[in-house]
């Protein structure tokens, strides 16, 4: 992030060009993906806007056991279908500014379209995520964290409609 007065501004830009190579035992591969994430924050608040576009003849290829940094790779969906275009809006708040250190939250909405949906329909999907996290700041349970993640997906692709809740308990051990 780059501070400008009281504001903090930032951007992540990524471009992936994936092409087949060698004997093409897995078939042909032709994909490019552009990912843009811009954000502005002041005080406890941060607003993020993202755009992602998939081009070429295939969906974005994932290497086994890897997670690429692309803006719309989120809790359930990744918005990487062939020809998919997706937009994201996200709002974060850090409640330390309001006297509750350790409490953070965000809400995010991503919508994608332009791909082939089920039964030849024009593909459309969206995901809404809510994330609330609290880390104990002092006492015998210091650094113990609890996070609730809720995701709602609506899609006319093979995933369909899905609602998911995750409760994550973590404990951070300082090394220094």
PLM region spans:
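C-terminal structural cap/anchor segments
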Residues: 54-120, 127-133, 137
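Short loop/turn motifs that connect adjacent beta-strands in outer-membrane beta-barrel proteins
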Residues: 2-9, 96-103, 137-146, 174-176
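Transmembrane beta-strands of outer-membrane beta-barrel pores
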Residues: 15-19, 42-44, 51-57, 95, ...
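Transmembrane beta-barrel domains of outer membrane proteins
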Residues: 1, 38-41, 92-96, 133-137, ...
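Transmembrane beta-strands of outer-membrane beta-barrel proteins
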Residues: 9-13, 36, 45-49, 89, ...
